A protein has these predicted regions:
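Short, surface-exposed recognition loops and adjoining beta-strand edges that mediate ligand/DNA contacts
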Residues: 36-42, 66-88, 171, 176-185, ...
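Membrane-proximal, proline-rich intrinsically disordered regions
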Residues: 3, 23-80, 281-283, 311, ...
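Extended ligand-binding clefts on enzyme/binding-domain cores
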Residues: 45, 50-52, 60-69, 209, ...
Length: 511
C-alpha cells in the first residue's frame, strides 16, 4: 500500500534531506515543521516527547498536508451533507466544492496530494504511524530512562493509543459504511497497529474489526490511568479520550455505553457548558474559554497549519469564504432570535453576495483568528462538552428515558437561549428535536454528515426550485440522497489501489 508501506517500514528511509530523494513516498518521512525528527530512533523519554510533538502536528497538518483536521475533515463532515452548510457558489474558489457538487465518478479524482487534497487519507495514516512508534517504544522496555520516567512514558503511550483510535475511527467513517447499516460487516479501512514490513500489502479490515480496535485502544488508554486528568489545550486528557469513546459508541448504535460514558464526563470531568453570555467570547482565539473544550488542537505560530489553507481561512468572510450556511439552516436558527448562536454568523458584504444572501448572516464565525489575523486560528475543536450533553440526551431518549433526555437537552438549550418555548418537555421531546439541536450546536465542526449517515437520514439540499434556497443547480442525485447511494462513501484514492492490489475499491467507482 503506497502510504502505509512508507509509514511503517522499519527505519528504511531516514528523514535527512540528503536521503529524501531515495525514499519511496518520502513526503511521509519529513520532519514535523518545528524541526523534530519524526522517525529517528526512540531511545529515551526525551525522544518520545519529540515523537509526541510530531504525532500531534500530523493531526493538525500544515500548508502541504491539509487532508485531516487542518482542513478537509471539517469540509467533508459538513459540506458533503450540504443541508446546513454548503459550498459558497458565489464567492468560493472550489476548495470546498468537491463533495458538495458530487460530480466525481472515478477513484482517480480522489487525491490526497498536498494542498489540493480532497480526501482524508495521508495525514490520518501518518498519525497512526507515529502513534505506533511511540507505543512500540514505550511498551518495549528499552528506553534508557524507562524506570525514572515511567509516568511520562505511560502517558505518551496512552495518548498515542487515543490518537491511533481517533484516526482509524475517522478513516472508517469516510471509507466504510456506517456501523449502524450492517453492524460493521462491510469493508472498512486497513487496520494497522504496529510496524509493517516495507513490502506489506494490508487488505481492508471490516468496519466491525476497525471499531473493535478503536474501542480497545480507547478503553486501554483510559483504564491505564496514565492520561492527564486536567484538560490541557492541544493534548488529549482522560476526559477527551472518554468523549471520543462516547462518540464512537454513538456511531455504533451502542446507546447504553455512549450514555454511560457521557454521564461520567458530565458528572465528573469538572467541565462546564458555556453560558449564553459566554458563548461568543468563548471562541476568541486570544482569550478562549476552555471550560467546554474536552479536546482541541492548539495551533500556534507559523509552523502549524494557520496559513491560507487552514480551515479557519476557508470558513471566514474575510478569507477564502468557501462555505456559507444554507437558507434552510438560517431559517431554522433565526426562528429563535434569542438564540446566541445567531451571533456566530456574519452577513455577506461583497455586492454580488449581498444580491443573493441579502442581510442574512451566512458566514460562520467560530474559528476567528487571533488578533484579527485569519491565518492565526489557534482554536481547532475536536470535541466539546456540548456534544456530550447532546449525546446523553439522544441516548437517553433512545433508551426510553424521556425525563433524562429532557434534562440533558434543556441543560444545553437554556445556556443558548432565553426563549422558554425552546425548552423541551417530556410531552413534546422527540428524537428529531434533539438532532436539530445537535445541528445548531455543531455546525462547522465536522459532524453533520456522519450523524446523517448513522441515522439513515435522507440528506436533502433541495427538491424543487421552490425550496432551492441558495444552492446552485445540482444533479438529481446530489439534490437528495441517502447512505445507499454509492457516492455517500468516498473512493479510496486510486494511487493506493495501484500500489496495493489487496485493497478492494468501494462499489461504484471506476479507475
Amino acid at each position: 500500500m503506497k502510504v502505509l508501506k512508507s509509514i511503517y517500514k522499519v527505519m528504511g528511509c531516514a528523514i535527512l534531506a540528503a536521503s529524501l530523494s531515495s525514499c519511496v513516498n518520502d513526503w511521509l518521512d519529513v520532519a514535523p515543521s518545528d524541526g523534530t525528527d519524526a522517525d529517528a530512533a526512540l531511545t529515551s523519554s526525551a525522544d518520545l516527547d519529540a515523537a509526541r510533538t510530531g504525532m500531534y502536528k500530523a493531526l493538525k497538518g500544515n500548508s502541504s498536508l491539509v487532508d485531516y483536521y487542518g482542513q478537509q475533515f471539517f469540509v467533508y463532515g459538513d459540506v458533503h451533507a450540504g443541508d446546513d452548510y454548503q459550498y459558497n457558489n458565489i464567492g468560493g474558489s472550489n476548495r470546498a466544492s468537491f463533495y458538495y457538487d458530487m460530480n466525481y465518478q472515478t477513484a482517480s479524482e480522489f487525491t490526497s496530494s498536498t494542498s489540493s487534497s480532497n480526501v482524508a487519507w495521508k495525514s490520518p495514516y501518518i498519525v497512526i504511524g507515529r502513534a505506533n512508534r511511540i507505543i512500540a517504544a514505550a511498551e518495549g522496555g528499552a528506553l534508557s530512562d524507562a524506570a525514572e520516567a515511567k509516568a511520562t512514558i505511560d502517558q505518551y503511550a496512552a495518548e498515542a493509543k487515543v490518537l491511533r483510535a481517533l484516526a482509524h475511527f475517522d478513516l472508517v467513517r469516510i471509507y466504510g459504511k456506517p456501523y449502524t447499516e450492517d453492524q460493521g460487516a462491510s469493508l472498512g479501512v486497513p487496520l494497522v497497529t504496529g510496524v509493517l514490513e516495507s513490502n506489506a500489502k494490508p487488505a481492508r479490515s471490516t468496519v466491525a474489526e476497525v471499531y473493535t480496535q478503536v474501542v480497545k485502544d480507547l478503553t486501554e488508554a483510559i483504564s491505564s490511568n496514565a492520561l492527564a486528568t486536567e484538560t490541557e489545550p492541544g493534548y488529549v486528557s482522560v476526559w477527551g479520550a472518554k468523549a471520543i469513546l462516547s462518540r464512537v459508541y454513538l456511531n455504533m448504535g451502542d446507546y447504553a455505553n455512549a450514555l454511560s460514558v457521557a454521564e461520567d464526563i458530565i458528572k465528573n470531568s469538572g467541565a462546564a457548558l458555556w453560558t449564553r453570555d459566554q458563548y461568543f467570547k468563548a471562541w476568541d482565539a486570544s482569550t478562549p474559554n476552555e471550560s467546554e473544550f474536552l479536546f482541541r488542537l492548539n495551533v500556534a505560530g507559523s509552523t502549524d497549519n494557520n496559513v491560507l489553507n487552514g480551515i479557519g481561512n476557508l470558513q471566514q468572510r474575510e478569507g477564502y469564504k468557501e462555505m456559507v450556511a444554507t437558507k434552510k439552516f438560517v431559517d431554522m436558527l433565526t426562528s429563535d432570535p434569542e438564540d446566541v448562536r445567531n451571533d456566530m454568523f456574519l452577513p455577506a458584504t461583497a455586492a454580488q453576495e449581498v444580491a443573493t444572501y441579502g442581510t442574512n448572516k451566512v458566514y460562520l464565525n467560530k474559528l476567528r483568528g487571533q488578533g484579527g489575523n485569519l491565518r492565526n486560528v489557534t482554536i481547532v475543536p475536536i470535541i466539546r462538552l456540548s456534544e456530550v450533553y447532546l449525546t446523553a440526551a439522544e441516548c437517553a431518549f433512545r433508551k426510553n428515558d424521556k425525563t433524562k433526555a429532557v434534562e440533558y437537552l434543556n441543560d444545553l438549550v437554556k445556556n443558548r437561549t432565553t426563549t422558554e418555548a425552546s425548552l423541551a418537555t417530556v410531552d413534546n421531546i422527540t428524537l428529531e428535536r434533539i438532532l436539530i439541536e445537535r445541528r445548531k450546536e455543531l455546525i462547522g465542526e465536522g459532524q453533520r454528515y456522519f450523524d446523517a449517515l448513522r441515522n439513515n437520514e435522507t440528506i436533502t439540499r433541495y427538491t424543487s426550485e421552490a425550496d432551492k434556497g441558495w444552492h446552485k443547480t445540482l444533479s438529481k442525485e446530489a439534490q437528495s440522497f441517502d447512505r445507499d447511494y454509492f457516492k455517500a462513501i468516498a473512493a479510496i484514492p486510486q494511487a493506493e489501489i495501484n500500489a496495493n492490489p489487496n485493497i478492494k475499491q468501494n462499489t461504484g467507482y471506476g479507475e
